[in-house]
Regions:
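N-terminal low-complexity segments that are often proline-rich with Ser/Thr-Pro
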Residues: 148-150
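A surface-exposed loop-and-adjacent beta-strand signature within N-terminal beta-sandwich domains
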Residues: 72-84
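Short conserved beta-strand and strand-loop elements enriched in small hydrophobics
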Residues: 60-75, 123
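Short, solvent-exposed loop/turn motifs
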Residues: 30, 42, 65, 75-76, ...
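Selective for proline/serine-rich intrinsically disordered segments
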Residues: 42, 70-73, 143
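Short glycine-rich, polar/acidic loop-and-turn segments at beta strand-coil junctions
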Residues: 30-34, 71-73, 102
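Residue microenvironments linked to proteolytic maturation
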Residues: 12-28, 66-68, 85-142, 146
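Polar/acidic, low-complexity leader/linker segments enriched in S/T/G and N/D
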Residues: 1-56
Length: 150
């Protein structure tokens, strides 16, 4: 088993206002299946769909789908670095579209400031799994343990 990370850079910034309070969200492709990514890996769409379903049930629906600012070295979320909470993750073809609320934490405030200044932030997913060589790419072969983060 090894740490597996994937980064996607095209996300949209959305500002929603409710009751005079503004909330900042990012939305876009969080995961992609059945294509070779720039890290030379391919994740079968069926495996991603199963893991996303499990992640939705275990984390998103319970308000526990937290993420960090930056690229952590391990598969678990460090609460002192939390910047966002994933509010939805759904499949559209071989893409998995996510939406995350930027939180009012120290790291969330840094993310808000960067986005406000026009910095383009991306989404990085990580987990622990196994990979095997398949033609010209590494094929993800086994699911992550329970504490995978997006």
């Amino acid at each position: 088993m090894k740490l597996i990370r994937e980064e996607i850079e095209n996300v949209e910034v959305i500002v929603e206002e409710r009751g005079g309070k503004k909330n900042l969200y990012i939305e876009g492709v969080f995961l992609q299946g059945d294509i070779k990514n720039r890290n030379g890996r391919m994740y079968p769409c069926g495996t991603l769909a199963k893991e996303v379903s499990r992640y939705n049930e275990a984390f998103i629906t319970k308000g526990r789908a937290l993420g960090e600012l930056g690229h952590p070295d391990g598969p678990t979320v460090n609460l002192d670095r939390v910047s966002h909470k994933i509010t939805s993750l759904r499949q559209e073809g071989s893409d998995f579209i996510g939406r995350a609320k930027i939180l009012s934490t120290p790291m969330g405030n840094i993310a808000k400031s960067l986005l406000g200044e026009g910095v383009k932030l991306g989404v990085s997913s990580r987990g622990v799994g196994s990979v095997a060589m398949n033609n010209d790419c590494l094929l993800y072969t086994s699911p992550s343990p329970r504490d995978t983060a997006i």
